[in-house]
């Protein structure tokens, strides 16, 4: 349910873009994000940090897009968000006792420290690559292609990378955890 709520504003953005334009879609994205955030808070009494950061980025970059009537801001939001995620992962890798991925999943999974480090670095690189891909698609290709890439391309890449990470985790899980 939470994943659907996180994905819903993106669907709203896509639909409003196809029906109207990037500016109406950006406004709809802001509203949908705020509604999803409010619903999440009232239903679960908790909002994940990544969800909150994403919502703040949508509010800031969406508002700038509307205020300056420039699609540059909403296009940059994707890259800035991915770079922030990558930086958070890298900072946790280099300056904290546990990588961020381990702090997020470590209660459910028992894995060797090297596996946590590899996962953490892999996701950091993934986010950096996605941020760079977004720059290329957003600024060198037509807006329609960028919207499709943002909604379908990045979502598909994230899903595939999540599955690859799941396989990697499974291969390194203790046997007793694999059975449960």
Swiss-Prot record:
It is a multi-pass membrane protein. Keywords: Cell inner membrane, Cell membrane, Membrane, Transmembrane, Transmembrane helix. Its main location: membrane. The chain crosses the membrane at residues 22-42, 50-70, 72-92, 121-141, 149-169. GO terms for cellular component: plasma membrane. It comes from the Bacteria. Pfam families: IspA. Belongs to the YciB family. Plays a role in cell envelope biogenesis, maintenance of cell envelope integrity and membrane homeostasis. HAMAP family: YciB (MF_00189). This is Inner membrane-spanning protein YciB. It comes from Yersinia enterocolitica serotype O:8 / biotype 1B (strain NCTC 13174 / 8081).
């Amino acid at each position: 349910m939470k994943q659907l709520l996180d994905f819903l504003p993106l669907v709203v953005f896509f639909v409003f873009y196809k029906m109207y334009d990037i500016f109406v879609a950006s406004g709809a994205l802001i509203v949908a994000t705020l509604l999803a955030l409010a619903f999440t808070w009232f239903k679960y009494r908790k909002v994940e940090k990544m969800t909150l950061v994403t919502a703040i980025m949508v509010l800031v970059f969406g508002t700038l897009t509307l205020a300056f009537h420039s699609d540059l801001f909403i296009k940059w939001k994707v890259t800035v968000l991915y770079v922030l995620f990558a930086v958070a992962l890298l900072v946790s890798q280099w300056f904290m006792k546990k990588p961020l991925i381990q702090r997020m999943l470590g209660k459910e999974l028992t894995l060797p420290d090297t596996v946590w480090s590899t996962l953490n670095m892999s996701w950091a690189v993934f986010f950096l690559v996605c941020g760079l891909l977004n720059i290329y698609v957003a600024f060198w290709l037509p807006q329609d292609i960028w919207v499709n890439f943002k909604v379908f391309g990045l979502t598909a890449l994230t899903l595939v990378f999540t599955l690859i990470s799941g396989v990697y985790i499974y291969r390194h899980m203790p046997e007793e955890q694999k059975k449960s």
